[in-house]
């Protein structure tokens, strides 16, 4: 049975954990699947996150356990340290392109189709805005037997040129609160978006280096400092 957010919506920690696994599988594939520590750092990073969260290790572990019950994440064995990967595309029943858009909406909040195309650059390269809109329309028109719509188009906020899209994985969206968030100046211009991408790229490089060190420590049987 496909995932149905109408009957069992994700909690905020679950959405952050799931979206972070989606992101890292695409941006730092050499470090993926993720250890609990790497996942915690990704969930709480300050760039490319809206809102910024401060989850604890126990909260992330609880979210993983709950997501595993829904077969949305998988624990990978065979290593000294447990690693985790998402099972989003199969568990929710969407293609990779749609998974990228949903992951971005979970991590960054409501966005226009144009913002999604820019922010998805390191996840999936959409040919143009029309291709983004085509996948969004498909997600919005999902039939009830497939779990119902997964995104909604919000009313255009006062002063905004374009309406924003929001995900429904955590249940119905309060349009008034979403409009208030979209009215804030943080990270909405193209220049800010480009800067955020550069910061994200640097953070991903650091994460990849840490993962390499951790793997070497596991192979050598020494503790990481």
UniProtKB/Swiss-Prot annotation:
**Cited InterPro entries:** DUF480 (IPR007432), WH-like_DNA-bd_sf (IPR036388), WH_DNA-bd_sf (IPR036390)
Organism domain of life: Bacteria
The family database entries (Pfam families) matched by this protein are listed as: DUF480
**Entry's SUPFAM superfamilies?**
Winged helix' DNA-binding domain
Family classification: Belongs to the UPF0502 family.
What is the protein name given in its UniProt record?
A: UPF0502 protein Ajs_3392
Which organism does this sequence originate in?
Acidovorax sp. (strain JS42)
